[in-house]
Amino acid sequence: MTELERLIEEYCSNGVEYKTLGELGTFYGGLSGKSKDDFVDGNAKFITYMNVFSNIELNLDTKDTVQIGENEKQNTIEYGDVLFTGSSETPDECGMSSVLTKHTEEKLYLNSFCFGFRFYDKELILPGFSKYLFRSEALRKQIKKT
């Protein structure tokens, strides 16, 4: 019996209910339909691939901007969202995550090389915890398998 199995048996006598992320929230894509020119003198902040890759929680002190039209439909990042890198040069670097752990009034947009996940229930997992959960070795191991 593994340590995990022992703990489940001891503390969860009725077992543990497993759910997929798809049952707990929804995935969304980053920016779409943008050209190189849209990233010159933009009017809105966007979160770069390297911001997601390099930080367990988003660095909001960024000067990266993108041009967003008044009626343009793009996904925005919300408090508690978990962001993932979609691809990388090596399998070990795929699926790196970062979490928006601070409330902000400013609209934030995600680069097109990443995707986001938003929990249906914003109180299910604290962002301060999910930033560690989604960067944990156990979860990273699962991502590398796929």
Model regions and ranges:
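Non-catalytic DNA-recognition/assembly elements of restriction-modification systems
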Residues: 3, 7-31
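A short beta-sheet element
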Residues: 48, 70-135
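Basic, amphipathic alpha-helical recognition segments used for DNA target recognition
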Residues: 20-28, 38, 53-54, 58-59, ...
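Conserved secondary-structure micro-motifs at functional edges
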Residues: 41-43
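A cross-kingdom feature marking solvent-exposed beta-strand/loop segments within repeated
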Residues: 1-11, 57-71, 94, 100-102, ...
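Sequence-specific dsDNA recognition surfaces
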Residues: 22-35, 50-82
